[in-house]
Amino acid sequence: MNGPARLALALSLAFAAAVAQSAPLAKGNILAANGIPKGEAPASSLPALKAALNGGWGLAANVTLTKDGRMYLVAAGTVSRILKGGDASKLTPEEMRGVNLNQREGDLDFGDDEVVDYHSPVELEKVAPLIPKAGTVFLHLSNVPGSTEAVAAMVKKRFSEVFKEGTPTNLVVVSNRGNLLIDLGREMPGLKRFHYVVPRGHNKVKGDFLVEAPSVIYSAKGYKADGIMVEYIAGHITPAYVDKLKKAGFEVVLGAVGCGAMPTADAVAASAPEYALAKDPAALYKALGGK
């Protein structure tokens, strides 16, 4: 075997050894997207959320803020679609309890012969005691019912009410509203805040277009974000794309809760983000080499 061949073999063996010794993504950094559905208990239901939190997984959950200051772990758009319109932020606790997450969109009458389990949106306070012992928990604020200053104050007040011993260190707030991230940082200086990115756009000049990493980095820096939760788009959100975000100083969540496709195990392994979304966390963990 000549010199170049020996060198190539040595490099190949070193790479293989590094891969074999590298730890898989930690369980707590694999984020169950809106929980882990169980039977007829759908995503965002209490059983689904508990399955993620009690299982040692991370969680990425959409949040609906209501004007009375409550926080429900469900997307505002989901609530509006089930009710066939309306502003989810205006619902009272009684009205929110009347929303069945198993309900077909706009169908308020199941019929006498149809049995469907009833699961209403879950208030943050119902799962708050489970969060400190879970993996990393990302709360994506899916609506902003008021000025960003008012909403930041609302979030601070609600956190102080439900987390009696202080906001858990494993809790992260996510938003696509830059001013809200800034205001949250002002209200709660120790709170981790991630910029929510859907790297697709449309305008009259470009038509449909994909947003490149430098633009995402520019925005996240302006918002003083700690990290970036980016929608996974195969062929666009590549390892090189993720690497640029990381080299700019941001932690990265691969996959955006409630938006687009979940990243594949191959994409997660190649990109090496700090966190990854999954509909089936156990399957992703196993595919990444976890036991």
Tell what function each PLM region has.
Residues M1-A8:
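Bacterial N-terminal signal peptides that target proteins for export
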Residues A8-A18:
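Bacterial N-terminal signal peptides
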Residues Q21-K291:
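Phosphate-group recognition and catalysis centered on beta-loop-alpha active-site segments
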